[in-house]
Swiss-Prot record:
Keywords: Antimicrobial, Disulfide bond, Fungicide, Plant defense, Secreted, Signal. This is Defensin-like protein 22. Residues 1-24 form the signal peptide. Its main location: secreted. It is found in: Secreted. Disulfide bonds join C34-C82, C44-C69, C53-C78, C57-C80. GO terms for cellular component: extracellular region. Belongs to the DEFL family. InterPro entries: Defensin-like_20-28. It comes from Arabidopsis thaliana (Mouse-ear cress). GO terms for biological process: defense response to fungus; killing of cells of another organism.
Length: 82
Protein backbone atom coordinates (compact mmCIF):
# COMPACT_ATOMS: atom_id res chain seq x y z
CA UNK A 1 0.00 0.00 0.00
CA UNK A 2 2.83 2.41 0.83
CA UNK A 3 4.46 1.55 -2.50
CA UNK A 4 1.34 2.69 -4.33
CA UNK A 5 1.36 6.02 -2.46
CA UNK A 6 5.03 6.61 -3.31
CA UNK A 7 4.42 5.72 -6.95
CA UNK A 8 1.39 8.02 -7.13
CA UNK A 9 3.32 10.88 -5.57
CA UNK A 10 6.26 10.38 -7.93
CA UNK A 11 3.92 10.31 -10.91
CA UNK A 12 2.26 13.52 -9.73
CA UNK A 13 5.66 15.23 -9.45
CA UNK A 14 6.69 14.08 -12.91
CA UNK A 15 3.46 15.35 -14.45
CA UNK A 16 3.75 18.67 -12.64
CA UNK A 17 7.34 19.29 -13.76
CA UNK A 18 6.62 18.17 -17.31
CA UNK A 19 4.25 21.14 -17.64
CA UNK A 20 7.06 23.59 -16.87
CA UNK A 21 9.06 24.60 -19.92
CA UNK A 22 12.72 24.95 -19.00
CA UNK A 23 13.27 27.89 -21.35
CA UNK A 24 10.66 30.02 -19.64
CA UNK A 25 7.88 29.88 -22.21
CA UNK A 26 4.38 29.10 -21.02
CA UNK A 27 2.85 25.84 -22.14
CA UNK A 28 -0.57 27.48 -22.21
CA UNK A 29 0.35 29.92 -24.97
CA UNK A 30 1.95 27.27 -27.14
CA UNK A 31 5.50 28.35 -26.38
CA UNK A 32 4.98 31.54 -28.35
CA UNK A 33 7.97 33.87 -28.65
CA UNK A 34 5.79 37.01 -28.79
CA UNK A 35 6.57 40.10 -26.69
CA UNK A 36 9.94 38.89 -25.41
CA UNK A 37 13.68 39.39 -25.81
CA UNK A 38 15.52 36.21 -26.72
CA UNK A 39 19.19 36.10 -25.67
CA UNK A 40 19.28 32.43 -26.71
CA UNK A 41 18.91 33.62 -30.34
CA UNK A 42 22.53 34.75 -30.26
CA UNK A 43 24.15 37.93 -31.59
CA UNK A 44 21.79 40.40 -33.16
CA UNK A 45 23.67 43.44 -34.44
CA UNK A 46 23.73 43.49 -38.24
CA UNK A 47 21.05 43.86 -40.91
CA UNK A 48 21.46 40.15 -41.67
CA UNK A 49 20.84 39.33 -38.00
CA UNK A 50 17.76 41.57 -38.11
CA UNK A 51 16.30 39.58 -41.02
CA UNK A 52 17.17 36.28 -39.32
CA UNK A 53 15.50 37.49 -36.09
CA UNK A 54 12.40 38.54 -38.03
CA UNK A 55 12.14 35.10 -39.67
CA UNK A 56 12.73 33.35 -36.35
CA UNK A 57 9.92 35.35 -34.71
CA UNK A 58 7.56 34.77 -37.65
CA UNK A 59 8.08 31.02 -37.24
CA UNK A 60 7.79 31.01 -33.44
CA UNK A 61 5.19 33.66 -32.70
CA UNK A 62 1.47 33.13 -33.20
CA UNK A 63 0.68 36.75 -34.14
CA UNK A 64 2.66 36.72 -37.41
CA UNK A 65 4.27 40.14 -36.76
CA UNK A 66 7.94 39.11 -36.74
CA UNK A 67 10.67 40.82 -34.76
CA UNK A 68 13.80 42.96 -34.83
CA UNK A 69 17.22 43.33 -33.22
CA UNK A 70 16.66 45.44 -30.14
CA UNK A 71 19.63 47.53 -28.93
CA UNK A 72 20.54 46.76 -25.35
CA UNK A 73 23.39 47.99 -23.14
CA UNK A 74 25.12 44.59 -23.42
CA UNK A 75 24.53 44.18 -27.19
CA UNK A 76 21.57 43.55 -29.44
CA UNK A 77 18.95 40.91 -28.69
CA UNK A 78 16.24 39.49 -30.89
CA UNK A 79 12.85 40.83 -29.77
CA UNK A 80 9.55 39.51 -31.13
CA UNK A 81 6.68 41.97 -31.56
CA UNK A 82 3.53 41.73 -29.43
Amino acid sequence: MAGLKVFSFALLLILTFSLIDVEGYNVENGGSLCCNNHPKFGKCNTKNDDQRCNSWCLNGCDNGKGGYCKSMSHGGQCHCYC
